[in-house]
Amino acid sequence: MLVTGFGRVAEFTAQALKNAGCDVYVTARNKLKLIRAECMGYKIIDFEKKSSFLYLFDYIFNTVPENIFTEEDVGHIKGKYFELASAPYGADKEYFIGRENDYIDGKALPGRYFSRSAAEKLAEITLKHINYGNGGD
């Protein structure tokens, strides 16, 4: 699992995924937030090298409300992409044409629930997908 950014929503999302037993990585442009994530026990990845690691993750949770992924970057994403950020979003949904099932629109989730509840709900949905959506593998 990869969480992009490490603000309030990202922090709760990472914690909920970790509490659910997931192996969580964090990437962010802000070096202080990366240090904080590492101190909290998450594995960190240098955001500037994103094209070399995006393909490694089955699930990417974007919380950065800014276009941080180019069309080329999205081409490297092999798993599911959860958009949790507000406009202008981390990636243009158009980049997922032909791969619509890989783009999960969760933008309303953090606003619909408090951050912790939203993160817990997201972890629950993700685990259901892993356990049941993929034949239990």
Question: Language-model segments: which ranges?
Answer:
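Rossmann-like NAD(P)-binding element
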Residues: 49-69
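Rossmann-fold NAD(P) dinucleotide-binding segment
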Residues: 66-81
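NAD(P)-binding Rossmann-fold cofactor-contacting core
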Residues: 19-40
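Conserved S-adenosyl-L-methionine
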Residues: 16-24, 78, 101
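Residues in the short beta-alpha loop(s) of Rossmann-like NAD(P)-binding domains
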Residues: 7, 29-31, 87
